[in-house]
Amino acid sequence: MSLLPYNATLCRVLRHNVKFIRSVQTSAARVSAEKTPIQVWGWDYLMRQRALKRPIAPHLTIYKPQMTWMVSGLHRVTGCAMAGTLLIGGVGFSVLPLDFTTFVEFIRGLGIPWVILDTFKFIIAFPIAFHTLNGIRFIGFDMAKGTDIPSIYRGAYLVLGLAALISLAVVVYPRWERHKKATLPTNH
């Protein structure tokens, strides 16, 4: 078996790649060590600001917290947290040799006090409820509904309150149902 045809093809492909790379290198703009006037002005401006002990960019701590940007930021954070949790959880449960039910039973078997478990349930339920309700609120914004400042604040407080109530219901209802079943009289 001869490798000559294969070698000839490989050399031809490499020769074309070298030609392409050389053409890109010669046609690309050269990087100059010399700065343009606007770059020089910008650098000098930043150095003057640094000498005056000023921050390069304003920090959030200099602004009065407002409900509008706090709720918007929380919406983004909850969305990213849920996406990350879904990604890590999905990959984790597909790779690991256990399923979600086994994981839940393992957590129950640890004997963690109910206060801690319910706190974690609330921490899990709140972002889901908040992100869902605030997403509905944002759909209203897309339809130009409730975009005046009083309505925005009312809607933000409503979303936060409802999300807290729904999360609390998600945590309390199963415990209430178990308590109700345990206290029902048995008919013998």
Curated annotation (Swiss-Prot):
What residues does heme b bind to? H131
Gene Ontology biological process: mitochondrial electron transport, succinate to ubiquinone; tricarboxylic acid cycle
- InterPro entries, per the entry: SQR/QFR_C/D, Succ_DH_cyt_bsu_CS, Succ_DH_cytb556, SuccDH_FuR_B_TM-su
What compartments host this protein? Answer: Mitochondrion inner membrane
The terms describing its cellular component in GO are:
mitochondrial inner membrane; mitochondrial membrane; respiratory chain complex II (succinate dehydrogenase)
Q: Which residues cross the membrane?
A: 70-95, 114-140, 154-176
Q: Please share the entry's free-text remark on the cofactor.
A: The heme is bound between the two transmembrane subunits CybS and CybL.
- Keyword Mitochondrion carried by entry: yes
Protein keywords: Heme, Iron, Membrane, Metal-binding, Mitochondrion, Mitochondrion inner membrane, Transit peptide, Transmembrane, Transmembrane helix
One Pfam family from the record: Sdh_cyt
Q: Which CDD domains match?
A: SQR_TypeC_SdhC (cd03499)
Named in its record, the pathway it takes part in is: Carbohydrate metabolism; tricarboxylic acid cycle; fumarate from succinate (eukaryal route): step 1/1
- Residue ranges, Mitochondrial intermembrane side: 96-113, 177-188
Annotated positions binding a rhodoquinol: S72, R76
Q: Where does a ubiquinone bind?
A: S72, R76
What does this protein need as cofactor? heme b
Q: Which GO terms describe its molecular function?
A: electron transfer activity; heme binding; metal ion binding
Q: Subunit structure of this entry?
A: Component of the mitochondrial electron transport chain complex II composed of four subunits: a flavoprotein (Fp), an iron-sulfur protein (Ip), and a large cytochrome b (CybL) subunit and a small cytochrome b (CybS) subunit. There are 2 developmental stage-specific forms of complex II which have the Ip and CybL subunits in common. Complex II from the free-living larvae (aerobic environment) acts as a succinate dehydrogenase and is composed of the common subunit Ip and CybL and the stage specific subunits FpL and CybSL.
Similarity comment text for this entry: Belongs to the cytochrome b558 family.
NCBIfam families assigned to the protein according to its UniProt record, in alphabetical order: succ_dehyd_cytB
Show the PANTHER family listed in the entry: SUCCINATE DEHYDROGENASE CYTOCHROME B560 SUBUNIT (PTHR10978), SUCCINATE DEHYDROGENASE CYTOCHROME B560 SUBUNIT, MITOCHONDRIAL (PTHR10978:SF5)
Q: What is the official name of this protein in its record?
A: Succinate dehydrogenase [ubiquinone] cytochrome b large subunit, mitochondrial
Q: Which organism is it from?
A: Ascaris suum (Pig roundworm)
